[in-house]
Structures are given as C-alpha cells and as structure tokens.
Amino acid sequence: MPSIAPFLRTTPLFTISLLLRLGLLFYGIYQDAHSALKYTDIDYLVFTDASRFVADGQSPYARDTYRYTPLLAWILLPTVRFPAFGKLVFAAADLLAGWLILRVLRRRGMDEATAGGFSALWLWNPMVATISTRGSSEGLLGVLTMGLLWAVDRRKFSLAAIILGLSVHFKIYPFIYAPAIVWWMDDARLGKETKAAPQSSSIKDAVANFFTPDRLKFGLLSLITFMILNLVMFAIYETPFLVHTYFHHVTRIDHRHNFSPYNVLLYLTSATPAHAAPAFRIESFAFLPQLLLSCVLIPLALAKRDLATSMMAQTFAFVTFNKVCTSQYFLWYMIFLPLYLPNSSFLRNGKLGIFALLLWIVSQAAWLQQGYELEFLGISTFYPGLWLASIAFFLVNCWILGVIISDGARQSTRSTVKFHVE
C-alpha cells in the first residue's frame, strides 16, 4: 500500500493546500456568476462595502451591519479595484496559520511527516478552506491566535504581548488566553531558578511572587497595544467605533444561524417590545458560566500542563457557552486541533474519536435541517424542533469539552509524541 508520508512533507503539504484554496476561489467565481445561491459570504460584501466607504473618505460604519475594527476595512482597501483581494488575504492567512502549526509541532519533537499530518487537519480541512475563500475573516483570527501560541512557545513574550493586544482589538474573544499565558509563565518555564517557598509564607508573599516582572511586562505591553489601537481608531471614528466594534457584541441579540441553546430565547426577546421586556433576562447572564470556565477554571487546571490544550479547551468552552454561536466560530478552536490531538483520548481510542466526530456532525445536521425548514420552507420550527436540536448540540459539545479537559489534566508538563506517519 503506497505511503502518504511523501505528501505530508512541507513542500507538497503546502502545494496541495494552496491548490485547494485556488480551486475553491475559481469555483466561487463561477458559482457567483451562474447560480442564484451565491458562494461569497454576505459578510464579505459588508467588508468590501466598508472598504469602499473608506476609500471615498468616509467611515466604514457608514455601511450598515459593519461591526468590526476599521483595521479590517483598511486591509481590504485593494478590493475597491480587485474584488477578490480579501479572499486571497484570508486564504493566505490560513496557510500562514498552518505554517505556524507546523513550526510548533516540529519544536515538540515530531518528524516532518508526522507534523505535516497533523497540520493537514487545518491546511487540508475543506471547512477551513471554504470559509476563508467565501470571504470570512476568521482566517486572520487563526493566524493571530496561532502566532500568539508560537511566540509564547519560543519565549518571545514581547511579541506575544503585542499579538495578544492586536488580537483582542480585532475580535475581543482572545482576551481569554491572557490568564492561561500569565499562569503558564512561571520561573521554571522562563528558565529561571525556582526558589522554594517558605512554609509560613503569607498571602502577601504569594501575591508578590505571582506578579513577577515578566508577567507584569507581558500584561502591560498587551494592554498598551490594545489601548493605542483603540485610541487611534476612536480619534478617527469617535463613538461609532466603540458602539459597532465593542458595545454591539455585548448587547447582541442574534437568533439567525445561531447554534446556541439561547437561540429561541433570543428570538422571543427580539420580538418583545422594549417597554414589555422583563427586568431580569436570563440571556444577560450567559457570560457568567462562559467566562468562569474559559478565563478561570480551565486555565488554572490546564495551562501549566499543556498551554495548547488549555487554549483549545478555553476556546471550545467560550464558543459552546456563548449566546451566539455560528459555524465560523468553530474555526476558533479548530486551529488548536493539530496540537491537542496527538496526545488525546480521541486518537488513542479510535472508536471514541469516530463516535465523537459522528455525534458532533449528526447533532449539527439535525439543527441545520430544522434551520432549513425555518429559513427556506417558512415552517415555524423554533419550538420544539430547533430548540431541542440546539440543546442536543450543546450537550454533545459539553461532553467533548469534558474529554478535552480530562486529557489536559492527565498530561505531564513534558509530554512527547511517540508515533510517526508511515
């Protein structure tokens, strides 16, 4: 039986990845020209319209529903003359993220073909390639988050802090990685001599030992980067920048294409007049379990064992418990799969891995079937069909999250990969 290992070496790995994305780009151009169902994501039209407003000397927020940093509209300014430019940027970001994954895996001691095999989970993933070539900007988030992990892994903490500040400015959610990285940055990992804590050390001493110069520098530099970007954007675009880039996402009530268990509740809330809305709304407190898991409990439990697994679990928890959950959000945690899977239960136990994948796909398909009847056939499936499908998908994700956390908790700080691609 021929080996696939030659295709997993760096040059063929990225050649195939590039051809996949180019093929999808050309297919998308054909489908947009010949089909009523367009390949290009509606968000891409929002991005390019915003760039057109910027090119005309106006605010990107002159475009209704533009809810992003002006940086994105600036990056996509060439789309005014070359409409496909943004898709090329997003596809290139996918490839760069894959290269960073490969670098991190190689640094862990994997041979080239094995590291390429796991990197292919991102680089050859049709879902990843399709989302970026349709014009979704999630590929940029992928390269930023993987760049953050790569920089920390290489002990380039100043660069990591700048990337973190930029990432949070770009999409808010990467702030969840700050607690994990800061907790991970102990003397042992920084190559410094660890001092044995006296038995009678006070809380004051423990706090003083935690706030080391390296941790303070990392936190301050990331905060300064974030604030400088925000101050510049506020100076140019004033209040609309804050409202559309940040405040909108805090108060967002979006029930369309939303896998979240809060989906039906958000629909009912959106249909309720403001004067009749109850003072206490349960969806307003959705962030409590979400942030408790992703910013406190998971980092404390996993970060010092395996930072990549911690970031995977944090992101998975954040997406699962978010009150708005769309298919693009899945890419936020899929970027970490190649780093988590080598030592995971899903790979050690093939049946468990296949079962989890099938359960995740089937529960998602059940939701999509209900959503199709609602959106395209005009059948009201909000209750019980769509609600039950949302609950089922949520429970499946909670179970998968539990497995990921258990895997991370079992890891030693010196885990190594002991298999190779044949």
UniProtKB/Swiss-Prot annotation:
Pfam families on file: Mannosyl_trans (PF05007)
EC number: 2.4.1.-
Pathway participation: Glycolipid biosynthesis; glycosylphosphatidylinositol-anchor biosynthesis
Keywords: Cell wall biogenesis/degradation, Endoplasmic reticulum, Glycosyltransferase, GPI-anchor biosynthesis, Membrane, Transferase, Transmembrane, Transmembrane helix
Gene Ontology MF terms: alpha-1,4-mannosyltransferase activity; glycolipid mannosyltransferase activity
UniProt family annotation: Belongs to the PIGM family.
Name of the molecule in the record: GPI mannosyltransferase 1
Gene: GPI14
